[in-house]
């Protein structure tokens, strides 16, 4: 009952999934009764599938919008402003998926770098409506970097009322830029300060 209440799916569906709701299924199921789906990278975008049944959405509605907005814009900028001419197609999302994450030790590598460099700070910025690199996973991952709490003054986390691309919402663009500026300024060591170790 609690899982159902927290995520917005009915209790029967949650029980049928044994409390483990696959992401793709969630995006399809949340608004299924309305015949709609939600976006993966930004759940504020709504899609309509060919049929309401199924385990996953037919497409990501946010990508349709973004590809029609950003691909022509970057192609025009490259061609007209920078004078770059090519027969190659520009892809917002290239044909590199699925990535091989077999030896992905990004978190461990970052933790090691932060332990070895006392001037290395981390700012994580996350959109509440991002289902790909979602807010709570990002926060959890950051917490795992410093279970002891020894580096907590070097870790910053900011959340925004947008999806994966926070800069698409003007208020978040302004705030995330300001947060980034403040982070950079606060991360700079005093020129007179000696090395810590």
Report the location of each language-model feature.
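Post-His helix in hydrolase/transferase enzymes
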Residues: 137, 167-182
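A generic secondary-structure signal
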Residues: 112, 144-145, 183
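Short, well-ordered amphipathic alpha-helices
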Residues: 138-146
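Extended hydrophobic-aromatic, low-complexity segments
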Residues: 122, 133-135, 149-151
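Catalytic histidine neighborhood in serine/cysteine hydrolases
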Residues: 147-165
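Extended, charge-rich low-complexity interaction segments
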Residues: 180-197
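Catalytic histidine-centered segment of alpha/beta-hydrolase-like enzymes
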Residues: 132, 161-172
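Alpha/beta-hydrolase fold catalytic core
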Residues: 1-132
